[in-house]
Amino acid sequence: MLQDTWALKAQREGYRSRAVYKLEEILVKVKYNNQSCKVLDIGCAPGGWSDYLIKKYPKSSLYGIDLLDIKPVKGLKFFREDICNIDNITEIHDKKGSFDLVISDLAPNLSGIRDVDEINVHELNLETLRVANSYLN
């Protein structure tokens, strides 16, 4: 299997996926440097973004939600659940309005039918925005 440069770099540096470099770029652009933040990672599988944030900001509290299971990330409180049910997760719901950062690299399963996929992506984006607006401080 061929791997691109970013995937190889991630592997060499011990990250779960190359997606960490997207997050790193975003954090640099917005000059984010809260050393002890409370983070909600929506659609956190395979755990790469959470793993990166725990390493970069070890005093932070991280909460992750995804339909897929992930290998444990030390310091991440993980919940295997649909984002649409996030309000039913007491440990996250009790912190509503107190998160410093909400991140998401969420994507739906694609059907290959463009019209269906576009609607699913749109609906998932709207739900992600709803959650972010509700849970950010």
Question: Model-predicted segments: where are they?
Answer:
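Mobile active-site "lid"/loop adjacent to the S-adenosyl-L-methionine
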Residues: 97-137
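Active-site catalytic pocket residues across diverse enzymes, especially alpha/beta-hydrolases
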Residues: 30, 57, 93-96
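Conserved SAM-binding motif I beta-strand of class I
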Residues: 61-66
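Conserved class I S-adenosyl-L-methionine
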Residues: 35-45
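Conserved SAM-binding loop of SAM-dependent methyltransferases across substrates and taxa
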Residues: 46-58
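S-adenosyl-L-methionine
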Residues: 67-109
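Residue-level signature of catalytic and energy-coupling elements of molecular machines
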Residues: 23, 43, 102
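Class I SAM-dependent methyltransferase Rossmann-like catalytic core
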Residues: 1-34
